[in-house]
Regions:
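Generic preference for hydrophobic/aromatic residues in regular secondary structure cores
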Residues: 7, 113-114, 213, 217, ...
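Membrane-targeting and insertion segments and their boundary/processing signals
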Residues: 7, 11, 34, 38, ...
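Conserved acidic/glycine
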Residues: 1-60, 248, 258-336
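Glycine-rich ThDP/TPP pyrophosphate-binding loop and its adjacent helix/strand module
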Residues: 122-317
């Protein structure tokens, strides 16, 4: 059951006005979800002590997520709410999960950093930096083995770009020509370390060339630019042309976690990036090109807020798991 506006996995390949409205609506849903999650955390409504928000990165999540198709697999890192919503997640069940309730996607056991739903192709979020990447490799191997015209996408941040497992996985994906996409959201910081203090070279897309893998870099604050680059790369992998790497350069408006006040960033930098807010700039573009009106945007904002209100209310009424749930979903059932 959906709790609010009906959402199904986006599965279109035309960049028309309906698609543009979908981009805007989905970015707004992600933003409102995460802002409400931050508020719920401060009110003590959530289970768990750490949340990693992707406010500011919505264009990257929606652009890449909307280039996927039904039947594709994906994994995410610890900052993965946006991509899951972009793939059609039920917001009521998402809130229930982070509130630690039985009706959450993982019965309240996974929380923010370990949410999953195989029905939507989500093989799981992962709190260990880079650990989700080889899991997506397995998904890609499965697709090729079964001769499916589908892809497997590993979403991760710039903090994983220096993890050895990424390059082991990239080598294997290239060697076996697997339909795997390595999708990076570069938000400029790994926790509190600026990216140029952690990487000797910032030409991340070029790293893929060592393995004969196509690599592209894109403005991660421009949803259409992200979608176009992703669509081309994803469809090539779907055709059997092998893996690809996409790097979407963006910025997180919050700190690493909700408790982080970002003392390592200066106000000028933050203000510069906020002027490129992906929702504000896209709204302006769509109004100027007459795809939407200001009234349309205002009404959409009210609709999204109402949807989030309903989702939070639903999650708040869900029950906590019984003690016996500690012993379920631990081992595979016999014969499976």
């Amino acid at each position: 059951m959906q709790h609010g506006m009906k959402t199904t996995p986006f599965d279109r390949i035309e960049l028309d006005d309906d698609t543009r409205k979908h981009f805007l609506r989905t970015m707004m849903r992600i933003r409102e979800f995460e802002n409400r999650l931050a508020e719920s955390y401060l009110r003590g409504m959530t289970a768990g002590s750490m949340f990693h928000l992707s406010v500011g990165e919505e264009a990257a999540a929606v652009g890449m997520g909307s280039a996927m198709r039904n039947g594709d697999y994906f994994t995410t890192h610890h900052r993965g709410h946006g991509i899951f919503i972009a793939r059609g997640a039920d917001l009521g069940r998402m809130f229930a999960e982070v509130f630690g309730r039985i009706d959450g996607y993982c019965k309240g056991k996974g929380g923010s950093m370990h949410i999953a739903d195989i029905n939507l192709g989500h093989m799981g979020a992962n709190a260990i930096v880079g650990a989700n990447i080889p899991i997506s490799l397995g998904g890609g191997f499965s697709m090729k083995y079964q001769k499916k015209a589908a892809i497997s996408v590993a979403f991760f941040g710039d903090g994983a770009l220096n993890q050895g497992v990424l390059y082991e996985s990239m080598n294997m994906a290239a060697l076996w020509k697997l339909p795997v996409i390595f999708a990076v959201v570069n938000n400029q910081y790994g926790m509190g370390t600026r990216i140029d203090h952690a990487s000797a070279s910032l030409k991340f897309a070029e790293r893929a060339e060592t393995f004969g893998v196509r690599g592209v870099e894109v403005d991660g604050m421009d949803v259409e630019a992200v979608w176009k680059a992703s669509h081309e790369l994803f469809e090539a992998a779907r055709r059997g042309d092998g893996p690809g790497l996409i790097v979407a350069n963006a910025y997180r408006f919050y700190g690493h976690g909700r408790k982080d006040p970002s003392p390592y960033r200066n106000k000028e930098e933050e203000e510069m990036w906020r002027l490129r807010d992906p929702i504000d700039t896209y709204r302006t573009r769509l109004v100027e090109t007459k795809v939407i009106s200001e009234n349309y945007f205002d009404q959409l904002g009210k609709t999204v807020k109402e949807e989030i209100d309903n989702a939070v209310e639903y999650a708040s009424t869900c029950l906590a798991p019984e003690d016996e749930e500690l012993y379920t979903d631990v081992y595979a059932s016999e014969g499976k």
